[in-house]
């Protein structure tokens, strides 16, 4: 009987098979469309959905548009009666919030999880598949901190920073000495930033092997620069960036696993570096490897941007460069035993506490740079099954739902930062500080329940790099041939497709003294 059925089906030859193939394709296509078009039910008090969306995909503008005149976020806000709105990313329901009260709630509510928010940020897709336990609160810890946070804080202790300070200073000096006399800081400062991060937060073993360091660097750069907007909407969708990120992560895991396993096999205690410290704690090997992969991705993510922009700023705003130079000379004079030695040599005698507290002009420029360059949408996930009321409205963030806030709203507010597109570090001086007129008016270094856990090292790193750069060279803005560009200004391009892309600005370096 089965044979007869098959015979009848195959009568007509290729034509019948063509019809079967077409029918099968249409069935799969219709099933896929039915799945994509399925709209999950949402809480009745969710903010109204924005009309700015595409079939099946949802609001792709969330990931592709920043803050230009009529961008997606502004249009969605404008058509909302409350300033809050809902939108889809594929089949994920997301709530967007605006305003001071909602901003405070976004940063302080205990049910809103920072790490899970990474799942709808393009750069973080597939980095933790799923989110690893090292980023989850540890019930055995008194502080309830995650494994990742506990270990990161320990590696930034005064003892650790003092131990590594001489080498970190040497890394900065070597990195600055290797710069071309016409350079693009957005690219050229990467190697110094990454070398210091690896040394302090992972192991000297990698830094000592230039090929191994370069291999780690390439894989981390792949994770930093390769992502897909569409994978935010369709996490399961294969794409070139999906595979590149997976391969890079796999390579990093294997590289780090080799280092850890060699220590374990040798039996003898290794050098007192972060790898050995975590092994001495008898931490799980998987936790150790995952920690180092993650920290080497996270640490340089913003430092490379801020470091490159700070050097551009030194070349454009030469009045601020002179203020920074004066601070450097004052700090060196206060601690160097040889006042006649070259300034760059004197820097080696500055102790840790002075490196952290003796550069007020760098700190002002750093705050202004962070304000301008950390302007993008941020995300959290309501981990609870219960809705969270949105202050100032009758709306809620449903349970198990993502919520976003765009920091450009506050960072480029005319009332909090008069003439916000202007680079003006003096706005952070006593007597100004207009941003204090609202809760969380300055979002640099994180706020609320999620302050930046790497802030101590991040600030110290910028102080060291900028101090060596300015001590060694006079910086000025130029084009790629070295021709001066005196009309150059520092601008955060709000119309760019990506919020973290640095402008192609060049700088001319003139050595200040012979060493």
From Swiss-Prot:
Keyword annotations of the record: Glycoprotein, Heme, Iron, Membrane, Metal-binding, Monooxygenase, Oxidoreductase, Transmembrane, Transmembrane helix
Cellular component, GO, one term: membrane
Membrane topology listed for this record: Single-pass membrane protein
UniProt keyword Transmembrane helix present: yes
GO molecular function, one term: oxidoreductase activity, acting on paired donors, with incorporation or reduction of molecular oxygen
Chief location category: membrane
Endoplasmic reticulum keyword on record: no
GO annotation (BP), single: biosynthetic process
Pathway the protein contributes to: Secondary metabolite biosynthesis
Ligand binding (heme): 452
SUPFAM superfamilies noted in UniProt: Cytochrome P450
Transmembrane parts of this sequence: 20-40
Top EC category: oxidoreductase
Cofactor: heme
A Pfam entry, by short name: p450
EC number: 1.14.13.-
Location of the protein in the cell: Membrane
Known glycosylation sites: 84, 406, 411
Changes seen on gene knockout: Impairs the production of neosartorin and accumulates blennolide C and 5-acetylblennolide A.
Similarity field: Belongs to the cytochrome P450 family.
Function statement: Cytochrome P450 monooxygenase; part of the gene cluster that mediates the biosynthesis of the tetrahydroxanthone dimer neosartorin, which exhibits antibacterial activity. The two different monomeric units appear to be synthesized by the same set of enzymes, among which the Baeyer-Villiger monooxygenase nsrF is the key enzyme for the divergence of the biosynthetic routes. The pathway begins with the synthesis of atrochrysone thioester by the polyketide synthase nsrB.
Protein known as: Cytochrome P450 monooxygenase nsrP
Organism: Aspergillus novofumigatus (strain IBT 16806)
Gene (UniProt): nsrP
